[in-house]
């Protein structure tokens, strides 16, 4: 840390009125690119319009203008998010049974969608309890609203209106900061100031505000709800905020005010800031006093972090200095030159952010069931399954996006002359070693993981169960995973003396928690079946990484195409006369990576769905006997491929296949339709461009004969457009099929 003199004067970081607001210009399709602004001559124009509308690099080379467009677009994105949130809250206010769910969350199912009676569609309005007919929703909003202390549909209505106001504000900000007062490039590149503001402001004050809301509003309201008080009798948020005596009735330490804080007797506040661990037995969710404590702690951490970076005052860290000091004995120049990359290539910045956010999203999906954060979430199995699946898919897409933007950075923004012998350069120089080793790992994992299943199927088919890998024959126990589970289960006694339970019941070491005779969470046993499927996870993830990393490391050049950088991020082949050079662009690696990402996530969500139904979810009798939904069949059945097909896919598809004529029939139609969308994708993926061009020319000839030929000349999709349409339908069809399969099943049996 170095001390230096403060900056002499305040720099003006904003340019006034840089771009005219012109509705005439915006009304012209393709106004952002010269070749598109001319209008269509062939049908390829509409595809290029969509491909390039947000590719700001292709509109201009001016980094400042690109930065402003991205910044402005972020406000537009936030506005859309606010509108979406407003819609969610409005449905809760206008079309839902939230208040009756709040009165009886164990018997009433959440619904916030009522289908209009058009051609018999009202069949979809199932009986969700409490005298309400509607579609059961699985987004978890009801549980979130209860946790935040919302007790009436009027409050939801007000929040919905507030979100629309914020959306308007965001749209205005997006326009204002591009057309009226646009930041200069130096402002976007001032990373220390940005780190301080984002860490202290967004994360620090944001967490502090949420902790404050939890302490003053959510905790007392939830305490009263848990005690069975009628929501209409509970004080309103403003009454709790303004009247300390009301709070002191639930949490006595409020009567002492801030004296314990300033006299450092912080333990006085332990009635509303707890460290209990485990789940609240009434709601099956985390103790809200634990989560309030957590957010307060997070706020303190980030408020400190937001004062760490050196700006006008000459003290604190410099990101550039930290990166350049980051050298080791085997790493050459270390991270020298990385700072310049991250302040001039937004693709490089985005790649890192997407990889991090994608990984965090996947971690969130695991925490949603292992540490259910909201009341009555854990016993709403359909919502649990939906939240896990949703966050897994999102995480997968974000990670593929990270590889896409990393490759775009390498093609468009990487300057080899400024990156000599730093870590990035060294990775690119020994890319052959990395990729060939990774390839070997993939082959090893693939043959061995799949081989274990094939062995089991063969032994099963030959009637030799004693020679199978299973918990009752040849055991392959996941001993490391079991050791980790055990360590966490024993932790409260040794590492956290004040905690009464572990971080999650899933680790084991305690009894299950049941709410109204339904299992919220129980210790999750791991055995041979989990060992087998975990190695399939390892295999699919490593193949995904192989494809994506090869795309990034060979994006600029390869032995096959040394001048790949000149061909750009996406190109079909290396020109005429060079056979065997098709489908080698960085874009094609992203395309292939998407399929393996889909494989990876599918195996994960199938594993989760079956494992939870078999070993966790179920009902508890008055005598304490637990009966799981599929009766614990995972350990024996999932050790063969045949078991996955017969006892998971086929057995659990019965609900969606037999859903016709019931309130779940929409899932039956979706199951059918999404299979069709998926199959439609194969038409784009298996046939070549020339086939379609010939067909089109024949059809155009017929139109000319009848003198009804269009002015815009029809063209077959380019190779890349065809593959893009193909992978889109493949993923959408596959995901919607899985969605219908999961929900029809779990809504029926959960």
From Swiss-Prot:
InterPro entries to which the protein is assigned, alphabetical: PSI_PsaA, PSI_PsaA/B, PSI_PsaA/B_CS, PSI_PsaA/B_sf
The keyword 4Fe-4S appears for this protein: yes
Coiled coil: none
Underlying gene: psaA
GO CC aspect terms: chloroplast thylakoid membrane; photosystem I
Catalytic activity reported: reduced [plastocyanin] + hnu + oxidized [2Fe-2S]-[ferredoxin] = oxidized [plastocyanin] + reduced [2Fe-2S]-[ferredoxin]
GO BP: any one term: photosynthesis
Subunit (UniProt): The PsaA/B heterodimer binds the P700 chlorophyll special pair and subsequent electron acceptors. PSI consists of a core antenna complex that captures photons, and an electron transfer chain that converts photonic excitation into a charge separation. The eukaryotic PSI reaction center is composed of at least 11 subunits.
Species of the source: Adiantum capillus-veneris
Leading EC class: oxidoreductase
Protein name (database record): Photosystem I P700 chlorophyll a apoprotein A1
Binding site for [4Fe-4S] cluster: 573, 582
Molecular functions per Gene Ontology: 4 iron, 4 sulfur cluster binding; chlorophyll binding; electron transfer activity; magnesium ion binding; oxidoreductase activity
Compartments (UniProt record): Plastid, Chloroplast thylakoid membrane
UniProt topology in membrane: Multi-pass membrane protein
Keywords, in A-Z order: 4Fe-4S, Chlorophyll, Chloroplast, Chromophore, Electron transport, Iron, Iron-sulfur, Magnesium, Membrane, Metal-binding, Oxidoreductase, Photosynthesis, Photosystem I, Plastid, Thylakoid, Transmembrane, Transmembrane helix, Transport
Family listed: Belongs to the PsaA/PsaB family.
Main location per the UniProt record: plastid
Binding site for phylloquinone: 692
């Amino acid at each position: 840390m170095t001390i230096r003199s403060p900056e002499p004067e305040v720099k003006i970081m904003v340019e006034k009125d840089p771009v005219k607001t012109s509705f005439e210009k915006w009304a012209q399709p393709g106004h952002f690119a010269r070749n598109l602004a001319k209008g269509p001559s062939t049908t390829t124009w509409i595809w290029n319009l969509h491909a390039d509308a947000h590719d700001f690099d292709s509109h201009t080379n001016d980094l400042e203008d690109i930065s402003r467009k991205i910044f402005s677009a972020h406000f537009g994105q936030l506005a859309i998010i606010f509108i979406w949130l407003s819609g969610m809250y409005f449905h809760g206010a206008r079309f839902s049974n939230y208040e009756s769910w709040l009165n009886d969350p164990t018997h009433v199912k959440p619904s916030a969608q009522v289908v209009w009676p058009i051609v018999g569609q009202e069949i979809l309005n199932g009986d969700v309890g409490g005298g309400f007919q509607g579609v059961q929703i699985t987004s978890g909003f009801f549980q979130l609203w209860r946790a935040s202390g919302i007790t009436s549909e009027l409050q939801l209505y007000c929040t919905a209106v507030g979100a629309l106001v914020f959306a308007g504000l965001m749209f205005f900000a997006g326009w204002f900061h591009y057309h009226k007062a646009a930041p200069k490039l130096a402002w976007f590149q001032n990373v220390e100031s940005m780190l301080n503001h984002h860490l202290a402001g967004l994360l620090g004050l944001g967490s502090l505000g949420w902790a404050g809301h939890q302490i003053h509003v959510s905790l007392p309201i939830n305490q009263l709800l848990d005690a069975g008080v009628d929501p209409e009798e509970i004080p309103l948020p403003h009454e709790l905020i303004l009247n300390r005596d009301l709070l002191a009735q639930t949490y006595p330490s409020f009567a002492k005010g801030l004296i314990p804080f300033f006299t450092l007797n912080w333990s006085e506040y332990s009635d509303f800031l707890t460290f209990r661990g485990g789940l609240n037995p009434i709601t099956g969710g985390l103790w809200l006093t634990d989560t309030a404590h957590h957010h307060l702690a997070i706020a303190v951490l980030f408020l400190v972090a937001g004062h760490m970076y050196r700006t006008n005052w000459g003290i604190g860290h410099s990101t550039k200095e930290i990166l350049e000091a980051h050298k080791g004995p085997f790493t050459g120049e270390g991270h020298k030159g990385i700072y310049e990359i991250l302040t001039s290539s937004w693709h490089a910045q985005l790649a890192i952010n997407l990889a991090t956010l994608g990984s965090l999203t996947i971690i969130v999906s695991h925490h949603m069931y292992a540490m259910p954060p909201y009341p009555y979430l854990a016993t709403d199995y359909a919502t649990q399954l939906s939240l896990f699946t949703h966050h897994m898919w999102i995480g997968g897409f974000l990670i593929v996006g990270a590889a896409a933007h990393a490759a775009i950075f390498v093609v468009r923004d990487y300057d080899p002359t400024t990156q000599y012998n730093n870590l990035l350069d060294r990775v690119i120089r020994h890319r052959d070693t990395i990729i060939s080793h990774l390839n070997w790992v993939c082959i090893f994992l693939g043959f061995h993981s799949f081989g274990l299943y094939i062995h089991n199927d063969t032994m099963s088919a030959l009637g030799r169960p004693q020679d199978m890998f299973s918990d009752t024959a040849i055991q392959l126990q996941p001993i490391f995973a079991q050791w980790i589970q055990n360590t966490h289960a024993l932790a409260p006694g040794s590492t956290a003396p004040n905690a009464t339970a572990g971080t999650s019941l899933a680790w084991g070491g305690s009894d299950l928690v049941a709410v109204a005779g339904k299992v919220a969470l129980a210790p999750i046993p791991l055995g041979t079946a989990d060992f087998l499927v975990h190695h399939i996870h390892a295999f699919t993830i490593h193949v995904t990484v192989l494809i994506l990393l090869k795309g990034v490391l060979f994006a600029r050049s390869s032995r096959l195409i040394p001048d790949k950088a000149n061909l750009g991020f996406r190109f079909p082949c290396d020109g005429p006369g060079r056979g065997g050079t098709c489908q080698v662009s960085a874009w094609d690696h992203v395309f292939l990576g998407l399929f393996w990402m889909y494989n990876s996530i599918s195996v994960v969500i199938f594993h989760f769905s079956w494992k939870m139904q078999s070993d966790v979810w179920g009902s508890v009798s008055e005598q304490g006997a637990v009966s799981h939904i599929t009766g614990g069949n995972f350990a024996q059945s999932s050790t063969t491929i045949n078991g996955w097909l017969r006892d998971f896919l086929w057995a659990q598809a019965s609900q969606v296949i037999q859903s016709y004529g019931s309130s779940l029939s929409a899932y039956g139609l979706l199951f059918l339709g999404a299979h069709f969308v998926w199959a439609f994708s194969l038409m784009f993926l298996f046939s070549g461009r020339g086939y379609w061009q010939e067909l089109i020319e024949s059809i155009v000839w017929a139109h000319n004969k009848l003198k009804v030929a269009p002015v815009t000349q029809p063209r077959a999709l380019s190779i890349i457009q065809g593959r893009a349409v193909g992978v889109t339908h493949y993923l959408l069809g596959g995901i919607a099929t899985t969605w219908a399969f999961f929900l029809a099943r779990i809504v029926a049996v959960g």
